[in-house]
Amino acid sequence: MSTGRVRVRFAPSPTGIFHVGGARSALFNWLVAKGAGGDFVLRVEDTDASRNRPEWTEGIISALDWLGISPGGYEGPVFQSERAGRHAEAAAGLFAAGRAYYCGCTRDELAARTGNAQHGYDGFCRERGLGPGPGRALRFRTPDEGTTVVLDVIRGTPEFPNDTIEDFVIARADGSAVFLLANVVDDLDMGITHVVRGEEHLSNTPKQQLLWAALGTPPPVWAHVPVIVNEKRQKLSKRRDKVALESYRAEGYLAAAMCNYLMLLGWAPPGDEEIVPFETIEASFRLEDVKPSPAFFDEKKLRAFNGEYIRALSVDEFVAACEPWLVPAADVPAAVDAPAAAGTGDGAAGVTTAVPAPPWSPERFSAEVFAAVAPLAQSRVAVLSEIVPMVDFLFLPEAPTDEAAWAKTMKGPALDLLTEAAEAYEKVAWDHDVLRETLIEVGERHGLKLGKAQAPVRVAVTGRTVGLPLFESLEILGREETLRRLRAAVERLDTAANPA
């Protein structure tokens, strides 16, 4: 298949969680296709039946949708497992052409002959003339001489002497093609012109380039993007590092912030600004500008990015974005978690993000109350999940209990101050400026400045020593509930001071 159009593919395996490295590769491929007016193909490489799970495939599609690579904007998904017949046909063709041979060597036999052979298989069956049969794998006949030169947009021209490349297996003894062959055959048949993938695949590239040549077709443009490392400069690991894209979604990272940050892992937009609209990224991204050196995944920087994106939302958008963390089983709102990568579909509409249920019952939540407090909270959260402990006092029947906070603040003049504050608040206009001035007056009678005077009031009403602006919070909570909590705190302090 050859159309003259740029055609890229993203080819994940559904054998585990979809991680940030896969997300970056998908975005890089997407932008190569978009920038050239070409095609993006989603190919699910699901040939490992023992490890594949349908939910992993669903997770890949959902994650791409969240990133803005939405169904309808690309070809696929194409499932590699459905192309087994074509892979077998290609393997048979290579055998018939003398470019591959059958090998009956077991691992034990190979080890007995070679020990720890530097270059792997020793070619024992190369000239034995074996045909297909039980226990026989098909190996590619690697050229004895010459050098395979890989033309890589990012890495230049790495060279691989052919005598260092073993006769590698291309089909198992059961006839199924291994990754190396299936990947090449699918790329060839789908007319893939650019292969953009992780650096870890570079070692496979000379073998695959030899297969492309054996199948009579020039190889695609290669581009191996840099490995992503943690703060210890170790390659990101699913077992060791926080890499699951879904965990970031559940924590409250916005798709736009995630896309922006992932694009910086190996590439940088022109100018000094790193936080830029995706349209700017799309217009300026070029594979030639990707750096080959390892890219550091800095979660603190990502968090800072996300805070900037949250603050850039309108209040209505912020309210909608917070909904999954405030209302049990709410879907991710499409209004905010919509496609970040050029707006090609419905974003996350209909996709439920697994976020913890809030600590209050659904009937206690008030959208009107949250809309009132949202402007106070928006500038104070870096991820959306932080909204829950910030506003929980508004929707719980009692202020959250923090005994350490209580012990720290409920001493000295706290009992008298809370008693007088409750009495004063019963009479004044319920306005945050009035509430503030009133507490200043109460505090002055006890020799306390406002910072000290408001500490026991905050703990009594919100359960915490820090939080949203206190007097605006009291205004939103309302006179009746504020007075009830202040009096409950007074009663507790009085009981402790005067036990029966």
Swiss-Prot record:
Stated name of the protein: Glutamate--tRNA ligase
Cofactor(s) of this protein: Zn(2+)
Catalytic function, reaction form: tRNA(Glu) + L-glutamate + ATP = L-glutamyl-tRNA(Glu) + AMP + diphosphate
CDD domains according to UniProt: GluRS_core
Species, as recorded: Parafrankia sp. (strain EAN1pec)
Compartments, as annotated in UniProt: Cytoplasm
Chain positions recorded as Zn(2+) binding sites: C103, C105, C125, E127
Main location (coarse class): cytoplasm
Stored SUPFAM superfamilies: An anticodon-binding domain of class I aminoacyl-tRNA synthetases (SSF48163), Nucleotidylyl transferase (SSF52374)
Record-linked Pfam families: Anticodon_2, tRNA-synt_1c
